[in-house]
Regions:
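Acidic-aromatic substrate-binding/catalytic surfaces of carbohydrate-active enzymes
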Residues: 8-66
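Short Pro-Gly-centered flexible turn/kink motifs
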Residues: 14, 60-68, 275-292
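Asparagine-centered strand-capping/turn motif at beta-strand->loop junctions
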Residues: 14, 126-132, 241
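Short, structured beta-strand/loop micro-motifs enriched in basic residues and often containing a Trp
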Residues: 44-50, 262-270
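Extended, loop-rich substrate-binding clefts of extracytoplasmic carbohydrate-active enzymes
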Residues: 70-119
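Acidic (Asp/Glu-rich), glycine- and aromatic
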Residues: 127-158
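Active-site/ligand-binding surface loops and adjacent short beta/alpha elements
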Residues: 148-232
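Glycine-rich active-site loops that engage anionic ligands at enzyme catalytic sites
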Residues: 220-263
Length: 293
């Protein structure tokens, strides 16, 4: 099932499967989100919950039981309940059933996804609450994919990622099969822009920590057209694209948690998390994106 809202600048469609934004068009009817070509990458803008990245050995343990889990959690792969689709807002909710708790994640939670259009801005708020009787630990992040080039008259080299100030981001190394190795390095020093090339992501994503910038966007250099994410307050921001040449899309991914590391314990309660909610607790985060095109 899908729901659509629009204003004078943007039209947004969200699918209840994964609570995923599957289309975002500007006033000219141009598609801004990647359209999930399965030959390249089959998703549009998945929600990452209740973990980000990979689990060590593809599993975790809790209460003496082992739970198998794929990359980026399971919220992106299950049906969410549509609560509201009117005016400028779409809102959905995910609550675990007994099968989900038995097979995937043995905790009670409520994950609410709220999409709101505001002029040329899309605000996507994820709220997690704990209705259960025990602590809820979780990871969470965003993974929107934006089509590039913006039109047929431009090529990949006409684009760059741009911070709002010069940056020397610390890159967390995940060369251990997608797991953090505990090493870090500098790929760029005192740079405000990162040139997009067809080989930029040959070694997968860049997970950046310690950013001071408020925004990170993808810019068309000759026109100034852009898609800009407000990444302030997120401890980690990734950039990524699939191994397709030429590059067909780029992802700007603000995360509140990290993948597992090569030496992580298997016990869920010993894993680093975005938040640890006591019974009755609530936590939220918002990604705001401005579409200047």
């Amino acid at each position: 099932m899908q729901a659509t809202i629009q204003n004078e600048f943007l039209s947004l469609t969200v699918d209840t499967h994964g609570a995923e934004a599957v289309s975002l068009k500007n006033a000219a009817g141009e598609e801004l989100l990647w359209q999930a070509d399965p030959a390249v990458w089959k998703r549009h803008a998945p929600i990452l919950f209740p973990w980000t990245g990979k689990l060590k050995d593809g599993s975790f343990t809790y209460g003496g039981k082992t739970y198998k889990g794929g990359q980026h959690g399971f919220a992106r792969d299950v049906e969410h309940t549509l609560l509201k689709a009117e005016g400028d807002t779409i809102q959905l909710e995910l609550r675990p059933d007994e099968a989900m708790k038995a097979e995937k994640f043995p905790f009670d939670f409520v994950l609410t996804s709220t999409f709101r259009l505001d002029g040329k801005n899309l605000h996507h708020t994820l709220t997690v609450s704990n209705p259960g009787a025990e602590e809820l630990r979780f990871g969470i992040g965003y993974h929107p994919a934006f089509q590039v080039p913006f039109d047929n008259s431009h090529t990949v080299e006409d684009y760059e990622f741009r911070f709002d100030q010069p940056e020397s981001p610390v890159i967390l190394d995940a060369s251990g099969g997608g797991l953090l190795t505990g090493k870090c390095y500098y790929q760029w020093k005192n740079q405000q822009a990162i040139q997009l090339t067809n080989d930029l992501f040959d070694n997968d994503s860049f997970c950046m920590a310690g950013l001071r910038t408020r925004t990170l966007g993808i810019y068309e250099k000759d026109t100034g057209r852009s898609i800009v994410c407000d990444v302030a307050g997120f401890p980690y921001t990734l950039i990524w694209s699939a191994l397709s040449k030429p590059v067909r899309f780029v992802c700007i991914e603000p995360w509140n948690s990290l993948p597992a590391s090569v030496d992580d314990p298997q016990e869920w309660e010993q894993r680093a998390a975005a938040a640890c909610l006591a019974p009755g607790g609530e936590w939220s985060t918002t990604l705001s994106t401005t579409f200047n095109r």
